């Protein structure tokens, strides 16, 4: 009698998820109820479920010196800007999201608070460039995900230029005050003495023109024809260029000042978008806008295999050459936060 024996080998295949493009969803927050661990959004929430992970983040709200002096833009109080924490969704009702954990940090809704849906994976492969929805003034600018296993890069994770926005071009009069030039640090469109400042953690201010740097945003170039200052993050931004053909009849030696550096430490544990560059001064329709800053990348994983690919969060460059007017400042670099033992 022929006896046949069959051996069956059980192979466990862990789920590998292929990702690329944009994986996060973003919502601005209109109020934070710390006592009840919940936030309110502007509209009914769709696409968020119990057990989902979300980042609660305050993007702006810093208080700065607004005097028309060299101290302009110095940070007096971060006022919650940069605070963030990872939370688990306990309940979703209409426009209210309640979290399982207590909200531990302070958030001011006026400081542009957002929640970011954070996907959770086992093993994950980045097959095409992974990026963020650019910051739009109320949400965006963040790439974040969790992997219980290995993250394999077959493409870059790139948040370049998705941070705070560069200053837009503002057309002012030629040769301020009869050619004396404007040497102030902040002004409005009525005074019209300089270009728009770049955006930073202090938000957009009423007197948003002129060379003073608002926190990590770059200052706008002053009349006449000076360049905008570069945005900043941990390091200070660079100053803009002066007018190349200075003359007694039309000054131009007060360029935009580079953004102020931000205080970052393991104790504070803050995360910031890169500051936007200031615009160049424009009176002949040839200036260029400031460039956007870099975004934030947050990854928690067991291990990351790079395969020669990179995680990038540079400030954007100003790619257009100014003509007869000031050039915009480049964006400040963003921030990359990793929790990966291997």
What is the role of each PLM region?
Residues 123, 130-337:
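Glycine-centric low-complexity/flexibility signal
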Residues 14, 340-342:
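Short, intrinsically disordered, charge-balanced linker/junction segments flanking boundaries
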Residues 59-63, 93-95, 102-105, 150, ...:
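Acidic glycine-/aspartate-rich tracts in secreted/extracellular proteins
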Residues 47-60, 105-123, 155-156:
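Extended Gly/Ser/Thr-rich low-complexity repeat segments
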Residues 77-86, 117-123, 153:
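Short coil-to-beta-strand transition motifs
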Residues 72-73, 81-82, 87, 105-106, ...:
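Ligand-binding face of N-terminal immunoglobulin V-set domains in extracellular IgSF glycoproteins
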Residues 16-84, 92-100, 129-140:
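Autoprocessing Asn-cyclization modules and mimics
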Residues 1-17:
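Bacterial Sec-dependent N-terminal signal peptides
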């Amino acid at each position: 009698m022929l006896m046949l024996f069959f051996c069956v080998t059980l192979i466990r295949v862990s789920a590998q998820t292929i990702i690329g493009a944009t994986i996060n969803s973003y919502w601005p927050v209109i109020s934070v109820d710390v006592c009840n661990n919940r936030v309110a959004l502007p509209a009914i929430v769709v696409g968020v479920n119990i057990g989902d992970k979300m980042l609660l983040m305050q993007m702006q709200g810093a208080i700065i010196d607004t005097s028309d002096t060299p101290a302009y833009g110095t940070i007096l109080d971060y006022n919650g800007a940069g605070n963030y924490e990872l939370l688990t969704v306990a309940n979703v009702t209409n426009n209210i999201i309640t979290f399982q954990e207590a909200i531990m940090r302070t958030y001011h809704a006026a400081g542009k608070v957002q929640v970011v849906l954070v996907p959770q994976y086992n093993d994950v492969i980045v097959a095409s460039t992974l990026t963020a929805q650019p910051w739009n003034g109320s949400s965006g600018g963040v790439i974040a995900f969790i992997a219980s296993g290995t993250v394999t890069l077959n493409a870059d994770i790139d948040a370049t230029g998705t941070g705070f926005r560069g200053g837009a071009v503002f057309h002012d009069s030629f040769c301020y005050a009869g050619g004396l030039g404007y040497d102030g640090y902040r002004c409005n469109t009525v005074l019209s003495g300089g270009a728009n400042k770049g955006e930073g953690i202090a938000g957009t201010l009423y007197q948003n023109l002129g060379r003073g740097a608002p926190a990590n945003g770059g200052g706008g170039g002053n009349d006449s024809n000076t360049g905008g200052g570069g945005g900043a993050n941990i390091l200070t931004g660079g100053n803009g260029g002066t007018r190349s053909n200075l003359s007694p009849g039309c000054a131009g030696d007060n360029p935009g000042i580079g953004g102020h550096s931000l205080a970052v430490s393991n104790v504070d544990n803050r995360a910031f978008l890169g500051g936007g560059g200031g615009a160049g001064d424009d009176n002949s329709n040839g200036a260029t806008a400031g460039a956007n800053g870099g975004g934030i990348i947050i990854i928690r994983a067991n291990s990351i295999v790079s395969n020669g690919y990179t995680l990038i969060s540079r400030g954007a460059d100003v790619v257009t050459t100014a003509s007869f007017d000031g050039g915009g400042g480049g964006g400040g670099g963003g921030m990359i936060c990793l929790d990966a033992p291997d």
